[in-house]
Amino acid sequence: MSGQLEEVLRHRYIYVPRGTETDTIQPGKRLGLAVARERSAHLTVVAPDKNSATHHPELAKLDIVTERSGHPQDGGVVLAWCPTYKVMEKIQRLDRSVVVLVEWIPSEFDAWARLRGAYNVVTGEVMDAGLSAEISKVLEGIVSEGYNGWTKGTDELVTLSFLKELAAAGAYDRELVLAYARQSKSEHTIERLKKILDKFETSQRSLVTTPDSDYLTSRNW
């Protein structure tokens, strides 16, 4: 990964996906430190809890933001160290920071990286969600319906309608919908959106498995 540093420095979002055959955790840590050093920028570690970072001597001496405490300073470099969705709420409103995300669970933050146009240090590619203006508008509609946390029946009905639009366009992607909402919503709220997605997916499966009521399925005609 060190050979890619010049390319990495061209990007604001850097994604280190969890490797299944080779170690990406330690190289990801070194990459985050190198990005901050090359940019002469303040480095903040964002991690689920302090213990997940402090047993690394290089990270223990840095500012560590956790699910329970702190917020990163905007304008520096953030090392999202094996983060959870919950702790990633802390970077939602950072407008100028460079984010290096080192993933723990394989592909957990793939949708996040696609939405952010992140540079994937494993593949050497800039990721892209490939959203058209129309699909982006539908996703924004889903987020807007969550202004009260998807707590009302009408919120659910309208959201289900938007999800049907995505499915009709062949653009329904559960993880992408959740990642889009996570750009501005809390994880507590996201749990309610997940239930709506579950309901939608169940209804979609029933459309596939339930025969048309007008089609004769009995041999007793």
Language-model features: locations:
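Short, flexible loop motifs at catalytic/binding sites
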Residues: 1-221
